[in-house]
Amino acid sequence: MSAGFVQRHLGPSPAEQAQMLQRLGCRDLEQLLQECVPAEILIDADQARDALPQECDERQALRELEQRAAANTVLRNLIGLGYYDTATPALIQRHVLENPAWYTAYTPYQAEIAQGRLEALLNFQTLISELTGLPIANASLLDEATAAAEAMTLAYGACRLKQARRFHVQADLFPQTLAVLQTRAEPLGIELVVADPAAMDFGDDSFGLLLQLPTASGACPDPTEVIARAKAADVLVIAAVDPLAQVLMPPVAQLGVQIAVGSAQRFGVPLGFGGPHAAFFATTEAYKRQIPGRLVGMSRDAAGEPALRLALQTREQHIRRDKATSNICTAQVLLAVMAGFYAVHHGPDGLTAIARRVQRLTAALAAGLQQLGLDVAAAPAFDTLRLRLDQPNGWIERLEAAGFNLLPLPDGAGISLDECSDEAEVQALLECFAAGCGRTAPAISELLAATPQAKSVGELPVRPAGWLPQAVFQLYRSETELLRYIQRLVSKDFSLVHGMIPLGSCTMKLNAAAELQPVSWAAFNRLHPFVPAAQRQGYDQLINELEAWLATITGFAAVSLQPNAGSQGEYAGLLVIRAWHRQRGEGHRNICLIPTSAHGTNPASAVMAGMQVVAVQCDEAGNIDQADLAAKAEQHADQLAALMVTYPSTHGVFEQGISDICALIHRHGGQVYLDGANLNAQVGVCQPGRFGADVCHLNLHKTFCIPHGGGGPGVGPIAVAAHLAPFLPGHPLVPCGGEQAIGPVSAAPWGSASILPISWMYIRLMGGAGLRQATAVALLAANDLAERLEPHFPVLYRGANGRVAHECILDLRPLKRSAGLEVDDLAKRLMDYGFHAPTVSWPVAGTVMVEPTESESLLELDRFVEAMMAIRAEAAAIEAGLCDRDDNPLRRAPHTLAAVTADVWERPYSREQAAYPVQGLRSNKLWPAVSRIDNAFGDRNLICTCPSVEELARAAG
């Protein structure tokens, strides 16, 4: 009989685990746990085993999940409000969404082995820039509502008038967007002024304007007059735009819009009960250094060839911390890649044809409804119409019985057509309404014959032809060519398909195929987030079970799955703490203590939550300086809101006295926020809710097996103690959250709901005992690497018993003194050895942080040790004067296939040493696509869109 799932999730076999334990001098995994984890917080094995269902095999777990999926009801969703059905091309589903080469990669920090993903993201940025007419577009954000909130805060920060606190919002806006804006605005002291644009009055206290184009009700008025008034008052103009409507509309930049946001969901990304979807954010050159999220830009490599990398990173949270433009790190890369390929697949003509069909069918439907004597509120501009109806609930129920979900309104219903709408569907809608009116439905063929293609979108003219001239959107009309293009990009990218990605604090573990399989089920991915409650019963059961399991694992009382990234979890957790203080009449508490070693998102999130950051020092052992913490807590006792602490620490150790630290903060009136980035070292071993934390965010895309997707999607739920549960985030359209809920932090009630089955499957497959074993093996792998690499690279921090946690920091700073080497030299040379680098220069400059996870085999760990030892030997050759300090395999890394096969080789080391430094690479090697990239050149010469056909032709000439 084959091994069960637990053993296949774990990389080292039982025999290999025994070998590793013997090297560490431990008799078993339980002894290792006792040496790593402080006794005061370590739970026993029986408690971990009994807290959750027992492990099961894939077939059993999938059967149970199929039962939950069957409890969902999938109808044709015409609800709209920013969520629309779409036809995902089978090629994209099979070769991108379901391809581990795309979904198991990490954020492209090591750009030389991420050129494929970066090119796909450049396609997405180019698409958005072409749609909006704005020159700078980022590589995705989390959802449309949070993108709008990011635009608001950018406008607020960019305003030169300190008294300006009024942000004007069009009343006909998606309600979830307005709610997220309200959540974001209140802690920052921003006043939202919601009104019809014609009635807006801009003054010295105004800093921004947000319009929705088309509006939530389906109109598309000409906004140029209100935009002109806003700009005359030095008010920054933002538009939330529908990308499919924007295919037909003039680029909003031509209307005077300075920032455009929206969701690319309807470009081939399933509804997914609300997510994940790629939002976009485009702006002018003036705000390129304030734009939130990742930005892909062109640069050049050491050979002078074009190369892509993440641009302008100095504005991001991992560098600027509390001064960052945003707390966003994880975004929605996999979904942005899908949307970009959707545009490549259809090209500009195909996209235009889809948009025209949707607009024409909507106009024909409106005409047919009017012929039936129904009151269509106004002529639809694009895809949405509103009906005024007597007894609207009866009509909603009638249409639901016929298989259609409409948008319920107090005086009627809304209907939004989409790419999947066709003549038969519109005819069926007309038949249903006609039956309710006691009349005969008009024929859709006759309605279409009387409905010419519109020459406008509402009050705006149609975009002229000639957009999307870039070659990538022109060349791949056949499936054969597009398949080959996708595979060419895959061949340039390093993912878990190729080898270990030992990034510290990132937990690049197995994403099992059985866990991901349900993501493609229609019962999960075709539900609209605002369907009637009776249609989502399967999701309700899954969500309730997953929340209960996560609460049990963490020792907390309640969980919210709404935050759709770890950064959003941090923000939500701090808002919950803030709400609790305010409810107690202590709203003045606004000091957030944060160790200097914390993730950059921590201080950025605290500032977003209206808190003031006070740094706490770390001692020489890498632990929180408890004397400094006590002094700061005492100094700020009257204003102390929270301590943000990562556990195990960002230095890769289980600190002693974590319970005492929590108790200290509580004595001074504060709450403890525990950053769950390192929860993979705690599951089944200790419970933050039991050792003193009040709130914790979890990264389901780390600890609970949702893949990283090359930089998203992620899910960052928060778990809270009982006294904070009433404040869990709510939603304006779907009841959820606590009795005194804070506002939503994401557009959808349960965030990126369609990937929650992945974590459900992981927990169900592993069971309580399996999860504890996974944690123990993660600690085993990290300690094994630490012991084996210590003779070559000093391990910077260890715990009280000489053990590390699930990761370790290797100190490379001595090599700078002895051999003139930088940490980047090792990172780039590791590419030549077939590895992605560990985390570089964080949390300590000049070091690497290694996290092997429980899923890597001993064979892969051996290969990594071999590579690191060989690199150390190369450094030793420099130290001994045997290699030139400036011209050696480390300083010239990585080495491309083009470089080592060039006719001329003038380097003082051999081609073989460059390309095949260890023998195993001869049979299996991913070549870096480009040589080392000049990041500074790219930032000085920012190019973040694809070249057009004409530009390519000029370059070739």
From Swiss-Prot:
This is Glycine dehydrogenase (decarboxylating). HAMAP family: GcvP. The keyword Oxidoreductase applies. Keywords: Oxidoreductase, Pyridoxal phosphate. Its EC number is 1.4.4.2. The glycine cleavage system is composed of four proteins: P, T, L and H. Transmembrane segments: none annotated. It is an enzyme of class 1 (oxidoreductase). Belongs to the GcvP family. The glycine cleavage system catalyzes the degradation of glycine. The P protein binds the alpha-amino group of glycine through its pyridoxal phosphate cofactor; CO(2) is released and the remaining methylamine moiety is then transferred to the lipoamide cofactor of the H protein. The gene is gcvP. Its cofactor is pyridoxal 5'-phosphate. It comes from Synechococcus sp. (strain RCC307).
